[in-house]
């Protein structure tokens, strides 16, 4: 069960009061601004050292709800990072490198930082601990050029995963386009041209049928976590704004029906995504928040299972303590 410690009267106390020794700390602010983003990163107390990557979604189109350059630019500059992304497995504006570069420039990212499409020159395999479905994780080869990662995710819905947060950003996001296929097909195919005919059977029909994909995402996220744990580290940030039922990989997403919530960060990706899920599930369904469609999508796709699978595999814990800034 999630533990939430109220911050009333404790605005200046940045130290977590952990009520459960097994709980992870999640930092939270309602300030969705460049300054708020920097402050929540600093609250984590981990210095970005060496060659730093900030992993984002570059967004399928300007209609997508991806994180805008003006929001993330000051943080990226502060840590002297490259923005990193990989090509997509599905046909669209970002499957082919030349098209992806065009989208990156149109979306304004090259104006704020050096951008690296990590699978532009190939891919590599990194080990997984949870090998139930996938036996390795196929990531962009440029991942080896980085010592530290800030996983900067936009929390939203997703057509296949139910929702997308830092776990999806670490798994599908860091995977090459062939790696994305490998995860989506739960180990059945590695060629992005073979994606659609190898998806888990009946994945749209029941939450259970989508489980192989969900568990493969968890395994891939853990692989990336362990990779950077063996280097200088990795931290996780979820931005809860413009929350649509559709992912930023959708070029024509449904309009957001939920008010902006805030920014959350943690060293534990499982606890962080669980916190964000709890925020959405606990919202009142009223004139300010129409949560019905998003919650239905998450439940239909067995979306919440990813945090429990991650916990079972040792990636993190679903127990958390909140420190509000």
Placement of each model-derived feature along the sequence:
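C-terminal motif of bacterial Sec signal peptides marking the signal peptidase cleavage site
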Residues: 4-7
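Bacterial signal peptide processing site
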Residues: 9-11
């Amino acid at each position: 069960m999630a533990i939430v410690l109220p911050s009333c009267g404790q605005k200046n106390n940045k130290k977590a009061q952990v009520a459960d020794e097994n709980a992870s700390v999640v930092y939270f602010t309602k300030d969705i601004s460049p300054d708020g983003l920097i402050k929540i990163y600093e609250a984590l107390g981990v210095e970005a050292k060496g060659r730093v990557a900030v992993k984002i979604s570059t967004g399928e189109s300007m209609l997508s709800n991806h994180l805008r350059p003006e929001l993330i630019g000051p943080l990226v500059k502060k840590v002297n990072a490259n923005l990193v992304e990989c090509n997509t497995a599905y046909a669209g504006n970002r499957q082919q490198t030349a098209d992806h570069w065009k989208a990156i420039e149109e979306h304004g990212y090259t104006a704020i930082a050096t951008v690296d499409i990590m699978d532009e020159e190939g891919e590599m395999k990194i080990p997984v601990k949870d090998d139930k479905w996938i036996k390795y994780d196929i990531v962009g080869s440029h991942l080896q050029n980085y010592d530290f990662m800030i996983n900067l995710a936009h929390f939203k819905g997703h057509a296949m995963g139910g929702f997308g947060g830092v776990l999806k950003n670490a798994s599908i996001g860091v995977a090459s386009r062939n790696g994305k296929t490998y995860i989506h097909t739960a180990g059945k195919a590695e060629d992005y041209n073979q994606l659609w005919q190898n998806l888990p059977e009946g994945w749209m029909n029941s939450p259970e049928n989508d489980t192989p994909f969900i568990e493969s995402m968890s395994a891939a996220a853990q692989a990336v976590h362990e990779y950077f744990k063996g280097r200088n580290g990795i931290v996780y940030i979820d931005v809860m704004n413009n929350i649509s039922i559709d992912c930023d990989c959708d070029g024509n997403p449904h309009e957001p029906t939920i008010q902006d919530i805030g920014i959350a960060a943690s060293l534990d990706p499982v606890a962080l995504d669980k916190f964000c899920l709890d925020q959405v599930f606990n919202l009142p369904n009223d004139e300010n928040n129409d949560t019905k469609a998003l919650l239905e999508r998450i439940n239909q796709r067995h979306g919440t299972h990813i945090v429990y699978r991650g916990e079972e595999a040792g990636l993190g814990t679903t127990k958390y303590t909140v420190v509000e800034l």
